[in-house]
């Protein structure tokens, strides 16, 4: 307890420097697309640095159409090799489509490419090392984890944001006025449970109720999970947790009340809003009770099996696409919690894949053209858009993607029957409103990563107790 008290005291002292930033919000853009959640995220980029060649090219590129960028890319990269790096392997699928598009303009165009996907959070180390070269290896990156992007990549001027003109217009903004990161897509991790038993999960607090041990990727191995916990302390999401708590019965409230009371002073010390104590209580119970897994794939494989009676988890929604039906395994063995008519509270967590040029990009025009292609065309986004649970940040591309792949009827069979209702993706608008998806705000995560982050570090994970 002394260690805990001392740590809280240190955190409280640091709030003098950070409290003002912690209240920063996220500016909504027109069209209510995924751009909304990152509008303010890039506001702390190094403002007084001297403009580099890449900066100047980005400034020009932001006023160009995709076709104009494509012509610049052809001049720059014909006969060369393009290196990209990302958290998603699908850049490797998108690049051949991009090259095919450039060939429609110049049939003689040719470009080799290599796409790398570092494991175990090594992408930040790789980009940092590459930034030290006069001319880098990587032209661009597709990267996740808004907190580390903000603090390690943007505040240090390693990565550069390019906003395609067509993307900005689709979102009702201008490339020059938009100050956030550029999201390719929002991915959602959603609460699910095995429905072959008697357990009921009709409130987000049920996932942290007595005896519940949801399957979840460890917060120290996939850090977007830790960002989810940070975001719960933001006022709007803390309020959502309070509203869900209010709808619990007396028995469940009596279980949670001592925990809420126990963290009330911590919430005040951390400078959180009035309902911050509900967020801390939920976080504490989650961290101390979740069952640690290494990847969302095994979590999905467990939950869809009849042997996982009453088990629950928080995992990437799109994993349901890969389930192979058998006697004991079926998508119908799970329920997406938020799809229940009587469900209350947050339905999951939404995080982004962001696109950047490197500060020393060897092929900046080509990088800009590729970024514009995958954010402004349905074909370009198809490497990701072909599957459920990934939503383009461009509302026009989002609409075209749904029209082509019809994810909202993803569970329907050829006879027009809704065979697997859990695979009927209700889409970004539904998830962010009715589904109460918690959306990552990189700036907020960066602001509270020391204060709330250290508080979380003091908690004892269930895996540490075994």
Where are these regions (language model features)?
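Mature extracytoplasmic/periplasmic domains
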Residues: 353-437
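N-terminal low-complexity, Pro/Thr/Ser-rich intrinsically disordered segments
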Residues: 35-77, 260-263
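C-terminal motif of bacterial Sec signal peptides marking the signal peptidase cleavage site
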Residues: 17-21
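Extracytoplasmic ligand-binding site segments that recognize negatively charged/polar headgroups
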Residues: 80-99, 113-126, 136-298
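Bacterial signal peptide processing site
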Residues: 23-26
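Conserved C-terminal helix/tail region of periplasmic/extracytoplasmic solute-binding proteins
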Residues: 51-56, 62, 67, 417-466
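Extracytoplasmic/periplasmic substrate-binding proteins
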Residues: 278, 288-360
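Short, polar/charged alpha-helical segment
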Residues: 42-48, 66-77, 88-110, 323
């Amino acid at each position: 307890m002394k260690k805990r008290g001392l740590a809280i005291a240190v955190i409280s002292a640091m709030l003098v420097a950070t409290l003002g930033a912690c209240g920063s919000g996220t500016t909504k853009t027109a069209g209510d697309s995924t751009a909304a959640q990152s509008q303010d995220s890039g506001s702390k980029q190094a403002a007084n640095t001297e403009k580099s060649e890449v900066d100047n090219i980005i400034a020009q590129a932001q006023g160009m159409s995709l076709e104009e960028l494509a012509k610049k890319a052809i001049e720059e990269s014909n006969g060369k090799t393009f290196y990209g790096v990302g958290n998603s392997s699908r850049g490797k699928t998108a690049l051949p489509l991009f090259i095919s598009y450039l060939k429609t303009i110049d049939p003689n165009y040719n470009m080799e490419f290599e796409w790398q996907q570092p494991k175990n959070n090594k992408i930040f180390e790789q980009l940092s090392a590459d930034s030290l070269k006069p001319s880098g290896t990587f032209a661009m990156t597709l990267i996740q984890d808004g907190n580390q992007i903000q603090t390690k990549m943007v505040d240090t001027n390693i990565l550069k944001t390019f906003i395609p003109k067509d993307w900005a217009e689709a979102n009702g903004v201008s490339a020059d006025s938009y100050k956030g990161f550029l999201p390719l897509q929002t991915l959602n991790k959603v609460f699910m449970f095995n429905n072959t038993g008697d357990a009921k999960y009709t409130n987000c607090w049920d996932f942290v109720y007595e005896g519940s041990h949801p399957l979840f990727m460890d917060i120290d191995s996939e850090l977007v999970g830790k960002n989810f916990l940070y975001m719960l302390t933001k006022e709007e999401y803390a309020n959502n947790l309070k509203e869900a708590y209010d709808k619990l019965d007396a028995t469940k409230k009596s279980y949670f009340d001592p925990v809420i009371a126990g963290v009330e002073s911590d919430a005040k010390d951390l400078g959180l809003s009035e309902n911050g104590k509900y967020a801390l209580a939920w976080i504490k119970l989650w961290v101390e009770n979740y069952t640690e897994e290494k990847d969302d794939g095994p979590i999905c494989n467990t939950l869809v099996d009849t042997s996982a009676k009453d088990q629950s988890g928080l995992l990437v929604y799109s994993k349901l696409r890969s389930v192979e039906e058998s006697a004991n395994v079926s998508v119908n063995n799970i329920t997406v919690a938020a799809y229940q008519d009587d469900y209350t509270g947050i339905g999951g967590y939404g995080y982004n894949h962001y696109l950047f040029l490197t500060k020393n990009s060897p092929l900046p025009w080509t990088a800009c053209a590729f970024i514009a292609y995958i954010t402004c065309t349905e074909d370009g986004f198809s490497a990701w858009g072909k599957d459920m649970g990934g939503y383009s940040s461009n509302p026009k591309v989002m609409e075209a993607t749904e029209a082509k792949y019809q994810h909202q009827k993803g569970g329907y069979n050829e006879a027009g029957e809704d065979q697997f209702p859990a695979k009927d993706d209700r889409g970004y608008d539904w998830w962010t409103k009715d589904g109460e998806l918690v959306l990552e705000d990189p700036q907020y995560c960066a602001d509270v990563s020391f204060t709330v982050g250290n508080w979380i570090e003091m908690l004892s994970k269930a895996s540490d107790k075994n």
